[in-house]
């Protein structure tokens, strides 16, 4: 995605390349450690009762809001940007734990591999299409009414947030636990 290079050139432009690499690497490591420690607990919670959709919604909301909020983070605000990014990764990763746990609610045992593969592939296809659109926005900002590639990247974060929200709604409304 756009975050690493945009972080360095826009939000952390006042840091040296070494410092910005250190910041993003450290933050990613800390978020990864948090996820590694919390994932087994969250997985057990998902297996314990009918809370999968509630927690999926909560984590998705964290990710959706965080991703969209990146649009509003001002230039040179690297501390805020990296914090919001970390929350977004936690929202995405935590949501995936509960999303994966829902497979037993939406599919018969003999269909779970097919259902999981279909969901996985459609998710990546949709995400890939949006990423392609976002890359085109970056490469040709004028085509999309943007003044600069910077505006295009900022709008890309907002578009990902909206996309995530829109394509999460069918799950929240149509799938029962």
Where is each model-derived feature located?
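Membrane-embedded alpha-helical bundles of multi-pass transporters/translocases
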Residues: 1-176
